[in-house]
Amino acid sequence: MEEGGNLGGLIKMVHLLVLSGAWGMQMWVTFVSGFLLFRSLPRHTFGLVQSKLFPFYFHISMGCAFINLCILASQHAWAQLTFWEASQLYLLFLSLTLATVNARWLEPRTTAAMWALQTVEKERGLGGEVPGSHQGPDPYRQLREKDPKYSALRQNFFRYHGLSSLCNLGCVLSNGLCLAGLALEIRSL
């Protein structure tokens, strides 16, 4: 980094720890814990766990992106930004925006849609089984085919869930690219 943009050692450590911590958390929640919990817990228990976990997860992601953006934005002369510095600021702003959309808008709607789905499923005696454990025809498919209200609720849930997943993947990618850029700047190990 150039003169005037030299981060002190402590600020560099905070930046690296917050960025790597956020990315590690995002990788774990996105690619490990969700799949393990989905395969191991009854459907409605999984939903309950996710409804408690995700608000914290998205708010922590939002806070980490905000801290990193503030650190970098305060350390650079805006008129003299290099391509990489401008890219890193853009990526962190993107991560902050996507995490905020997830935390403040998508997560509450996804969770509300999930509760509505679970209400209908409980009325039909569904939701207590671990995915893949039932034999015979899929009772959820049968419910979708017979109940247009349930089918509409399911579409609504998957719309919000899909948008939330895309935002989350955007955060993972943005933070991963920032980390890759930092790693490429390391002169020795």
UniProtKB/Swiss-Prot annotation:
One Pfam assignment: DUF4149
Tissue: Widely expressed with highest levels in pancreas, followed by adrenal gland, thyroid, liver, mammary gland, prostate, kidney, and retina; lowest levels in skeletal muscle. Overexpressed in cisplatin-resistant cancer cells (at protein level).
Any one GO CC term of the record: membrane
Compartment list: Membrane
Transmembrane segments: 18-38, 53-73, 81-101, 166-186
Superkingdom of origin organism: Eukaryota
Keyword annotations: Membrane, Transmembrane, Transmembrane helix
Membrane topology: Multi-pass membrane protein
Family assignment from sequence similarity: Belongs to the TMEM205 family.
Function: In cancer cells, plays a role in resistance to the chemotherapeutic agent cisplatin.
Protein's recorded name: Transmembrane protein 205
Originating species: Homo sapiens (Human)
